[in-house]
């Protein structure tokens, strides 16, 4: 009994420690104006490349430690095409989310990325034409209302700021289009992962996904920077040379993300999706609160109301999963994505 509790604390504590630190590193890495470079580190494909490289190495170590029944070579030959397609949506989603930070504040970004149900339902409704239950529609309504309240109250125009307000509204719209596109691709990734698990003839573990998806993320990011945007690599290297502190943030951020993925898959395999969902929801709440405290974000009363409404919707969705678990119909909706 004591050993079981220690394993549980180890799994949950690992997720909290790695992803709370990951969240605290993500904000300055993406939004800080670095002193010597004089600009933000807006090179998302380099960030994704470094993170994927470290995560792939961790995934390989995880496979060696886990020794799954399905060998890596057999998994590779059977699911190469699936991994390439799933990773492509991930490779596009992450930079879109990073670019959205040029137009929306970090708390809005975190709040939107906390709502995994929205993109999943969008994909099932638009792509797979799946009927949406009334309970999920209610959750979507709560989340949408909460984000709207949070965003609108954070952009109240004063009587003498009409021109600035119009410019801000236009920028916010661009930010939400980018963020919404990223969320839709996240939903597409999760839906394709669900299909992969359903059709698999052998048990696919988190370690398999972690290694293969990150391998293809490296491939896609390298292809993009070589064929489409060579300036991004040059800009990134120039900034890393001018501000060496960025490299420390970047490596720490990537390591926390990779370690966090290991803990997510470990928790999923040991305790199931229900425990993982509850840990993920509370972790995201604490990440927002920690960001507000550490970085001194000003949050109005109505914005707090918006945050509470959003997480009420997310908790309702988690409770719905709990009821399904009791009926023996757990649907695995938490795979590779971190908040």
From Swiss-Prot:
<protein>
    <recommendedName>
        <fullName>UDP-galactose transporter homolog 1</fullName>
    </recommendedName>
</protein>
<feature type="transmembrane region" description="Helical">
    <location>
        <begin position="208"/>
        <end position="228"/>
    </location>
</feature>
<keyword id="KW-0813">Transport</keyword>
<feature type="transmembrane region" description="Helical">
    <location>
        <begin position="273"/>
        <end position="295"/>
    </location>
</feature>
<dbReference type="GO" id="GO:0005789">
    <property type="term" value="C:endoplasmic reticulum membrane"/>
</dbReference>
<keyword id="KW-0812">Transmembrane</keyword>
<dbReference type="InterPro" id="IPR013657">
    <property type="entry name" value="SCL35B1-4/HUT1"/>
</dbReference>
<feature type="transmembrane region" description="Helical">
    <location>
        <begin position="246"/>
        <end position="268"/>
    </location>
</feature>
<feature type="transmembrane region" description="Helical">
    <location>
        <begin position="138"/>
        <end position="158"/>
    </location>
</feature>
<dbReference type="Pfam" id="PF08449">
    <property type="entry name" value="UAA"/>
</dbReference>
<feature type="transmembrane region" description="Helical">
    <location>
        <begin position="91"/>
        <end position="111"/>
    </location>
</feature>
<keyword id="KW-0472">Membrane</keyword>
<dbReference type="GO" id="GO:0000139">
    <property type="term" value="C:Golgi membrane"/>
</dbReference>
<keyword id="KW-1133">Transmembrane helix</keyword>
<keyword id="KW-0256">Endoplasmic reticulum</keyword>
<dbReference type="GO" id="GO:0005459">
    <property type="term" value="F:UDP-galactose transmembrane transporter activity"/>
</dbReference>
<comment type="function">
    <text>May be involved in specific transport of UDP-Gal from the cytosol to the Golgi lumen. Involved in the maintenance of optimal conditions for the folding of secretory pathway proteins in the endoplasmic reticulum.</text>
</comment>
<feature type="transmembrane region" description="Helical">
    <location>
        <begin position="43"/>
        <end position="63"/>
    </location>
</feature>
<feature type="transmembrane region" description="Helical">
    <location>
        <begin position="301"/>
        <end position="321"/>
    </location>
</feature>
<comment type="similarity">
    <text>Belongs to the nucleotide-sugar transporter family. SLC35B subfamily.</text>
</comment>
<dbReference type="GO" id="GO:0005460">
    <property type="term" value="F:UDP-glucose transmembrane transporter activity"/>
</dbReference>
<feature type="transmembrane region" description="Helical">
    <location>
        <begin position="5"/>
        <end position="25"/>
    </location>
</feature>
<keyword id="KW-0762">Sugar transport</keyword>
<feature type="transmembrane region" description="Helical">
    <location>
        <begin position="171"/>
        <end position="191"/>
    </location>
</feature>
